[in-house]
Amino acid sequence: MINLDEVDASPQRDAVDNWHVRFGIYLPGITFNKGYALKVRVIHEADQFIHGIEPKDFFLDWANGSAYDLWSITVALTPDPASHFGQNGTYLYRYELLLGNEDVSFWFADPFGRAAGLGTLSAFIIEDNPQPFPWTDTGFSVPEIDDMVVYELNVREFNRDFQGVIDQLDYLLGLGVNVLELMPVTNVKEDVEWGYTPLGYFAPDDRLGGPLGLKSLVDACHQRGIAVLLDAVYAHTHPEFAYCLVYDATGEPNPMMGVFAGEFFPDRPGTDYTKEFTRDYFVQLNHYWLREYHVDGFRYDYVPGMYDGPVGQGYANLVYRTYEDSKALARFDGGNGRSKIIQCAENLPDPIGIMSQTYSNCAWQNGLLDRARDMAQWQYVSADFAHRLDPDFLGYPQVFANAASGETFPVAPFQYIESHDHPRFINEFGLARNRDLLGESYGDRSRFYKMQPYIIALYTAKGIPMLWSGQEFGENWGLLDWGVGRNLFERPLHWEYFYDAAGKALVHLHRVMGGLRRVQRALRSRGYFYYYDDPAHLQDGVIAFRREASADGAHPAECLIVFLNFSDSDAEVWLPFPTAGVWAELVDGTRPAVVIAQAGQWAPVVVPSNYGSVYKCT
């Protein structure tokens, strides 16, 4: 089994207060008795580009008989007057593998490195009196699935780095957000990258703020009741990841990579979960992130590349072991031995199956997004859109149950109309004349109002609402369907849109709907969802449905009726109201109330064009 205490670069003081660093790395099948030698090359960051100062080389010892062929050495940081070596600061290191006197792999980073430099370099820090991070999140509890509103963001595009995200957390709270889904934040080779070709799985990227920056972000989120979800790319890696590079170069049997499930890259294999080392690596990785960084779960990218069935060795095994491991941490305690850890599967071919058969309590699914985009593009309204707002109708499970152990927990799909994988939703309504540097057209933001009924639908749907950063003020970047320009081109948010008429209107609506989602139990309930299936509604461009929450002892029963008008004209909508009383409109709070004398009475409601209304009996 992988022991994280014997790998990485670990600074320590000796008995006379001198610094030493212990280096350790597993290279299964790479052994001294085959003629291999391994050295680590170390340099102080301040000396990295100084003429005449070379890295210091140290050869590691192979531990004969170790399960995964551990190589290690403890190095004294003896001060060198001609350089910064031996002084406090950041040190960079990399490994070099030789066979006899010949280089086999000239340069590879530590696959267990806890910090990274720019590019293919690992790092460690020497400082006087290092202190553990001062966490302040002892009382934080992960939100229940039904209470979640998720905000997906690319840290660099959102606001530069981890500190930039911290600066905007109170803004996100105003949108009703209580879960951040961070696109990959671990070390990558390129300066501009989405992060889906990881190089250092244990190291937050230094360009985003490194380990300290990410811990500060998670702690700041927890102070505000916001959970943090990491995008976990466990099906494929960068070709220069150590367990690709070394074994491609040596021809030795690869302990991690191989053909397993649906390969993401056609020209090279991904991670192979039939191999014990692969399974152990990612279980230990999740264990580390949950404890060292206090993250609250994972959005597993491209699950088809990891999944070999509900009792397989890949994805199902990983999420089960991670679920059981999370029970030791108080923030996940859901009572009766249940963990609230967030494990979200991107298994687009079968989101229903993955939530029904594995320890995944949520999943991405493109059903609502696809229907919304088709409606926007072709200017029609479909009953299928209403059904997409009710996952129960589509056969999604409400609960995962392990018949063998008796374990159960609630599950729900993510609901979204935008994600990082798709062009901006506002672009479906028309394109502007100006283009970005790749020649992609921006969306026409003058048609922002067409988004409004979709936003109201998103916050009033069953399932877990997810926003893609910038959606709330009409971000309008284009996006290529393929090619390096898709994920190697930076698209920073146009924060200036927040101040114009379109941005103000959209942000206001997101804030109102986020507040309603937070306050109105019926919008978070697993209770009754009733679609008013009336062909006349569809002809007028209208969808209407009802959300209900049963009385639970502490709260009375609650009923809301939602009207969505996708047309360019105000619409008068008739339907039967289920209870007598005064029905008040909640979105704007300025529209006339509807007075119902008896249950089942039909009454009209005028719904504004390209907008919606939510009525509640008061």
Segment roles from a protein language model:
Residues 1-32, 49-152, 160:
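The feature marks proteins involved in alpha-glucan
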Residues 303-311, 435-448, 494-504, 600-603:
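Active-site rim elements
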Residues 597-618:
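C-terminal beta-strand-rich structural cap/linker in extracellular carbohydrate-active enzymes
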Residues 113-121, 294, 319-482, 518, ...:
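Conserved alpha/beta catalytic core and glycan-binding cleft of carbohydrate-active enzymes
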Residues 494-536, 611:
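Aromatic- and carboxylate-lined catalytic core of secreted/periplasmic carbohydrate-active enzymes
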Residues 22-31, 38, 566-581:
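Surface-exposed beta-strand/loop patches in extracellular or lumenal glycoproteins
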Residues 111-118, 131-132, 136-148, 154-342:
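Substrate-binding/active-site clefts of carbohydrate-active enzymes
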